[in-house]
């Protein structure tokens, strides 16, 4: 239940309040951070995957509802270790992958989010995958 509350229900509450402020202005951006688990289930991740699927569906519904009113709703997928103190301290072997582009830089994630926010209305993206080149999707093991 906690996973669903943190991933899906919190997204609903946050999105609702953000939309409430943005609607009178006729513009704004709401970004719901997703994960690959929200697009494709995986054994052992039922609670997380279910919650992330719910968040993605919420984002898609809000995009259809709010887009015509000038609010850009997007669902960037962030998949991979992020260069944080938590990763450096608890997963030093993952952190070593930074030298080879195998860990996400928070500044680069921010650049991608800014890109979504500044897109012209005639070319809005809904989903953008952010992952290091060394993720298995690229055939690297």
Each language-model region and where it sits:
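Catalytic loop of short-chain dehydrogenase/reductase
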Residues: 29-54, 60, 64-68, 82
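A short, exposed helix-loop element centered on a Lys and neighboring polar residues
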Residues: 15-16, 60
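A short helix-coil junction within the Rossmann-fold of NAD(P)-dependent oxidoreductases
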Residues: 17-26
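A hydrophobic alpha-helix adjacent to the NAD(P)-binding/active-site core of NAD(P)-dependent oxidoreductases
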Residues: 3
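Conserved catalytic-core motifs of eukaryotic protein kinase domains, centered on the activation segment
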Residues: 25, 42-43, 87
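C-terminal helical subdomain
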Residues: 68-80, 94-138
